[in-house]
From Swiss-Prot:
Example GO BP: protein modification process
NCBIfam families listed in its UniProt record: nrdI (TIGR00333)
Family assignment from sequence similarity: Belongs to the NrdI family.
Designated name of the protein: Protein NrdI
Gene of this entry: nrdI
GO molecular function: FMN binding
Highest classification ranks of the organism: Bacteria, Bacillati, Mycoplasmatota, Mollicutes, Mycoplasmataceae
Reported function: Probably involved in ribonucleotide reductase function.
Disulfide bonds: none
Length: 157
C-alpha cells in the first residue's frame, strides 16, 4: 500500500446530506468531464484556468484526475486547480469524499491524487478508475454515491 493511503474510520466520516453532488476537475483532454456526464448526477466543474474559481456551499464528493510520474514520485499528483479550489476553506469544509482517475501505466501512483486528498482532508477515498472509466465504473460509482448520501440523510433524521 502506498504511504499516502490512510485508513479513515466510520467515526471520522461526515456523511453527506441532500442529494448527490459531484465537484470535478478535468483537463483539456476532457476525459474526466466525459466520465462525469455518464453519471447523470448533479455536478460542477472546477475551472481549468487558474484565474477563475468556483465556490461550493453544499456537501459534495470530489472527482479528480491524477498527474504524477510513477514509482514514489508523487509531486504534482493533485492538479493545481484542485489545490486552489481546496485552499478555499468553505469549499474544503463541504468535501465528504474523493474519487480519482489515473493511468495504470504509472503503477503504484495510479490514481494517487485520491489518497493524497483523502489523507489531507480526512475524508474517505471512495473509488478509483482508469482514464475514461468503463460502464462498470459508472455503475459502481453511482451506487456508491447514492448509498453514501442515503446513509447521511438517514443518520441525520
Amino acid at each position: 500500500m502506498h504511504s499516502n493511503v490512510k485508513k479513515v474510520t466510520d467515526k471520522d466520516v461526515i456523511k453527506p446530506v441532500g442529494i448527490p453532488f459531484v465537484v470535478y476537475f478535468s483537463s483539456i483532454s476532457n476525459n474526466t468531464h466525459r466520465f462525469i456526464q455518464k453519471l447523470e448526477i448533479e455536478n460542477i466543474r472546477i475551472p481549468y484556468e487558474l484565474d477563475q474559481s468556483i465556490s461550493v456551499n453544499r456537501d459534495y464528493v470530489l472527482v479528480t484526475p491524477t498527474y504524477s510520474g510513477g514509482g514514489e514520485y508523487v509531486e504534482g499528483a493533485v492538479p493545481k486547480q484542485v489545490i486552489k479550489f481546496l485552499n478555499n476553506k468553505e469549499n474544503r469544509s463541504f468535501c465528504r469524499g474523493v474519487i480519482s482517475s489515473g493511468n495504470t501505466n504509472f503503477g503504484d501512483t495510479f490514481g494517487i491524487a485520491g489518497p493524497i486528498i483523502s489523507k489531507k482532508l480526512n475524508v474517505p477515498f471512495l473509488y478509483q478508475f482508469e482514464l475514461l472509466g468503463t460502464q462498470h465504473d459508472v455503475s459502481q460509482i453511482k451506487q456508491i454515491l447514492f448509498r453514501f448520501w442515503e446513509d447521511g440523510n438517514n443518520e441525520r433524521k
